[in-house]
Structures are given as structure tokens and as C-alpha cells.
Amino acid sequence: MTWWEALLLGLIQGLTEFIPVSSSGHLVLGQYLLGLDKEAADVTFEVFVHFGTVLSILTVYWDDVAELVEEAWAGLRAPRAVPTRFAENDTFRLGVFILVTLVPTGVAYVLFREPLEQAFGSPRFTSAMLVGTGVLLLLTRIGPRPDGDLSGVKAFVVGVAQSCALVPGISRSGATICTALYQNVAPERAANFSFLMLLPVVLGGTVLKGLELMEQGVGAAGLSLGIGTVAAYGSGIGAIYVVLDVVRRGNLQYFAYYCFLIGGLGLWLL
């Protein structure tokens, strides 16, 4: 992988991890169009660019993450007070909701890991799923503006949506934000929850891929990996702020049009 290919794919990863247009879908299509060997690119490169997106979340949400860790530690130190903390502390409750989303996502990954990995080899299937993401985004225009809060049930349903986004072409941020909005969760709350709940998922995936990488060895040049990581980090920070602004304004349909365009072109040309 050349440095400019690493730069391009790093930018794609950072932008599309948070902008609701499917990072996995764009990496599949990008690697296909660049003629990269998927087996060599995925294991090595994805570990590093996902680390870049982890740093993006930590940079933007450092105060929130620090509070979540503090509340989790307090809960572990005083388990008998957990019900009270859950009822009275918004941050502690948010942490519990994030844990709830991991249940359906983890189950889906364990049960369907093999077919999911096979799906990453089909650019046409990925293109079709991008069109599906566009439909999800467009449906947010229906109905009144949401103004509610999260609950345990809503968080679980959002987790189910996140598990569906394991399929390449289905945007994780798009599926989770839209599902929260469909359940009358206020837009900014929905977007912030979507980004915070991504952190343990990406960390877990990075660790698993990292272990695989240790067995296989680094397949790409160190310079290219560094460039890709920095590109993913910088573009990821910008993408988070862009999405927060778009969600506040209720304009997710613009991303839907983009998904229709890219997905349609993929179905036509690939």
C-alpha cells in the first residue's frame, strides 16, 4: 500500500465512521477500486485506522468518557448503591445503556461472524446495503421532531440496530442514530449516544484484530500505517462535529441522497 492510498483510505475511514454513510461499505468499495488485496489490507490497516477513530472519540468526548469511567468505578466500589445511582445519576444511567447495546451486538457477531466476513468480499452486495442506509436516513423526515430521552428498552433496540450494521454497507452511526430518533430520542442525545456507544465496540474490534495481526505480522509499511492513522484521527474529529450539527438541524436526508448515489453507481458499474 502506497502512502497516498493509506492517506485516502484513512480519510475515508475517519469520515465515514461517523458520517452516516457506512465506513465498512466505503472501505470495501475503496479497496476494490484501488485493486488492493483485501486479506492484506483489512487485518493490518483496519487495526490502525480504527485506533485513529478511537482517538477521535476520546478527543471530542474526553470529559464524558472520564465521567463514565468515574461512575463505573464508583458503582464497582459500592454495588449495593447501583440501583440508587441508576435512578438518580444521568451519567451512570448512560453507562448502563451503553452496556445494554453491547449485548445484541456481541451475540450477532458471535453467531454470524463467518457470513459477515464473506459479505465483505461482495462490492455489489455492499452497494445494495448503502441504498438501504439511504432509506433509513430518509425515513427520519417522517413525523414530528423527537424530543424524548433514552431508556433501557430503547438502548437495547439501538443495540439491535448496531448489530445490523455489522453488515458492510449499513452505516453504524446511521442505523443507531435513526433508530434512536424513531423512538423519540432527542436528536443531539441520539447522536451523542451513538458516538459514545461506538467506543467499546471499536476498542473491542481493534483488540481482536490486533491479536490477529500479531499472529500474521504487519503487512503494510509503517509509514503508510502511520499516515492512515493520523488521517483517520483528524477526519474523524471533523466528521463528529459535522454530524452533530446536521442532526441538530434535522437534515439527515442529505446523507441519504449521497448513499443512493454511491450505492446506485456501485450496483450499476461493479
Curated annotation (Swiss-Prot):
Bacitracin is thought to be involved in the inhibition of peptidoglycan synthesis by sequestering undecaprenyl diphosphate, thereby reducing the pool of lipid carrier available. HAMAP family: Undec_diphosphatase. The keyword Hydrolase applies. One of its GO terms (biological process) is response to antibiotic. InterPro entries: UppP. This is Undecaprenyl-diphosphatase. Its EC number is 3.6.1.27. It is found in: Cell inner membrane. It is a multi-pass membrane protein.
